[in-house]
């Protein structure tokens, strides 16, 4: 019942725009039943009949199954749906979701769409995409990166980091294994044993006090053990807090978000956020220019100015910057005005880099985030000793 308005809208779209301008592609389940592994078409026959009864005639049927559709099964679906055999597309399980476009390309799905809608024929160049798929499915050395979060049981909570590490591994010809670690567990146990053996650490963005001390523990562990570290947003801020506590000796250093009455708020609220009570859509959001000075981040980006996406309400307290930099933590990235700190790097460490912005948001399969790429590259070197 809930889907009926959408079905009617689809039917009306075909009527109002003209059938030459609308194409219906129906994805249906083709289950495998019994010990002999026989594919069954009954669910597809039923759903096609239902659609036809609603005034929608599928032009293409995509049969989702564990394996490639048997030829007789595909022909049977075409017969009952009254469509050409080539319009029945097999969608078997793939090694990776990124292989799916290649599977459809082999079955000439683009040609079906071009022919049905009268579009100009194009021949896509998928050489780079094939190479990418080959790399992520046939990677070489394996590195293990720990992601320290507090929602790690929810698969998609840190999906941008997960995918970016996959892309970085593809570029470097390695596989990246992720070790998910709950920050509150580190905090409660008071131990960093869960980190032992990893080749790199990511502390991603977040908010709130729960798990913050666990993330600080992870930042300290990576710093003192010379393990590659990437902090993002909250991970950038907490890396600063950890450094101030354990290197500068400011034992009560903290963020004013976590300790509003604290004496040493090395992380403080943005000036424009002071007094804001309605928190909805008031953060510093979106693309902002970042100016990079000499350092790892600039080398990885290959340029002195970049635009990256932001989502934060707090920043490094400018009153502490000189002390922090004199102690060896350099802010090699700043905003366009030079006042806000955007990137930090630790001197004498193989890779201890953090950013106030979210580099994972702009990462793409053929162009992974430079900071994640640097982390994986450093992790490979760390693993090989």
Predicted regions and their residues:
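N-terminal beta1-alpha1 cap of cysteine-dependent amidohydrolase-like domains
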Residues: 1-348, 356-385
């Amino acid at each position: 019942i809930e889907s009926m308005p959408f079905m009617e809208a689809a039917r009306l779209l075909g009527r109002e725009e003209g059938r030459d301008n609308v194409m219906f592609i129906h994805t249906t389940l083709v289950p495998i039943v019994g010990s002999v592994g026989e594919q069954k078409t009954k669910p597809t026959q039923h759903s096609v009949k239902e659609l036809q009864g609603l005034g929608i005639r599928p032009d293409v049927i995509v049969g989702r199954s564990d394996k490639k559709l048997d030829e007789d099964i595909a022909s049977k679906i075409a017969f009952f749906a009254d469509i050409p055999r080539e319009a029945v597309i097999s969608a078997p399980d793939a090694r990776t979701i990124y292989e799916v476009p290649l599977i459809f390309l082999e079955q000439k799905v683009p040609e079906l769409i071009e022919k049905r809608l009268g579009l100009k024929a194009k021949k896509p160049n998928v050489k780079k995409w094939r190479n990418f798929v080959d790399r992520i499915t046939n990677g070489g050395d394996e590195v293990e990166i720990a992601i320290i979060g507090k929602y790690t049981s929810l698969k998609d909570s840190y999906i941008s980091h997960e995918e970016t590490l996959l892309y970085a591994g593809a570029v470097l010809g390695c596989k990246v294994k992720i070790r998910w670690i709950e920050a509150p567990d580190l905090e409660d146990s008071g131990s960093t044993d869960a980190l032992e053996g990893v080749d790199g650490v990511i502390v991603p963005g977040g908010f709130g006090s729960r798990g913050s001390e666990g993330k600080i523990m992870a930042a300290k562990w990576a710093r003192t053990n010379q393990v590659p570290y990437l902090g993002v947003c909250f991970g950038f801020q907490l890396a600063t807090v950890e450094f101030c506590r354990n290197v500068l000796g400011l034992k009560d250093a903290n963020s004013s978000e976590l300790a509003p009455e604290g004496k040493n708020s090395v992380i403080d609220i943005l000036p424009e956020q002071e007094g804001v009570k309605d928190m909805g859509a008031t953060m510093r959001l979106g693309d902002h220019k970042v100016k990079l000075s000499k350092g790892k981040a600039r080398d990885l980006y290959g340029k002195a100015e970049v635009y990256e996406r932001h989502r934060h309400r707090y920043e490094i307290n400018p009153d502490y910057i000189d002390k922090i930099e004199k102690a060896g933590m350099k802010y090699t990235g700043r905003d366009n005005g030079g006042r806000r700190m955007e990137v930090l790097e630790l001197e004498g460490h193989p890779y201890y880099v953090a950013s106030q912005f979210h580099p994972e948001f702009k990462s793409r399969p053929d162009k992974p985030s430079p900071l994640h790429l640097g982390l994986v590259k450093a992790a490979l070197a760390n693993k090989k000793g």
